């Protein structure tokens, strides 16, 4: 059995997404993590915040934080899914 490391992924979502669309987006990423064997998934919607500087012509955006345990393969799949999703403005994954 492979060792699971703890990770935190923070992603910034376009402000024009509705609450329902944002909830579906969050659920899809949680489902992706669960399918690939991630454990202890904790997701926090940090709400809509003003950005310190403009990112892709946006002054504010929704912040979502996910903490979970997984392996490197899970991180690669999650980040690949975020790269192709046009609703994601920016994301960052760190080991904790």
From Swiss-Prot:
The keyword Plastid applies. GO terms for molecular function: small ribosomal subunit rRNA binding; structural constituent of ribosome. GO terms for biological process: translation. It is found in: Plastid, Chloroplast. PANTHER family: MITOCHONDRIAL 28S RIBOSOMAL PROTEIN S6, SMALL RIBOSOMAL SUBUNIT PROTEIN BS6M. Binds together with bS18 to 16S ribosomal RNA. This is Small ribosomal subunit protein bS6c. It comes from Guillardia theta. The gene is rps6.
